[in-house]
Amino acid sequence: MPRSLKKGPFIDISLLKKVEKSVKINDKKPIKTWSRRSTIFPNMVGLTISIHNGRSHIPVFVTEEMVGHKLGEFSLTRTYRGHTADKKVKKR
């Protein structure tokens, strides 16, 4: 269920401060964050944000199409290795 419009989008305050500082000094270094629940704002476009997936930080370059989505959507937490194949070949 989406967030109520009267509440507005959520962004972690510490992440917002890091983004504003990076935009102000035009810094291109990745911003490291653990806040997967934060919404991507328009002023984040063009920045690289390293999002924690539980094990490591995944660098994500923010584009215009990502605005309005959550950071956690772009850093997968589970690895899918495919279904295991049958070890015995069935004879007919």
Curated annotation (Swiss-Prot):
Q: Which residues does UniProt call coiled coil?
A: none
| Pfam families assigned | Ribosomal_S19 (PF00203)
Task: State one molecular function term (GO).
Answer: rRNA binding
GO CC, sorted alphabetically, is: cytoplasm; small ribosomal subunit
Matching entries from PROSITE patterns are given as:
RIBOSOMAL_S19 (PS00323)
**InterPro entries, sorted:** Ribosomal_uS19, Ribosomal_uS19_bac-type, Ribosomal_uS19_CS, Ribosomal_uS19_SF
Ordered alphabetically, the record's keywords are:
Ribonucleoprotein, Ribosomal protein, RNA-binding, rRNA-binding
Q: Please describe what this protein does.
A: Protein S19 forms a complex with S13 that binds strongly to the 16S ribosomal RNA.
Which PANTHER family does UniProt cross-reference here?
RIBOSOMAL PROTEIN S19P FAMILY MEMBER (PTHR11880), SMALL RIBOSOMAL SUBUNIT PROTEIN US19M (PTHR11880:SF8)
The entry assigns this protein to a family as follows: Belongs to the universal ribosomal protein uS19 family.
- Its recorded name reads Small ribosomal subunit protein uS19
- Please name the source species: Buchnera aphidicola subsp. Acyrthosiphon pisum (strain APS)
Origin organism lineage: Bacteria, Pseudomonadati, Pseudomonadota, Gammaproteobacteria, Enterobacterales
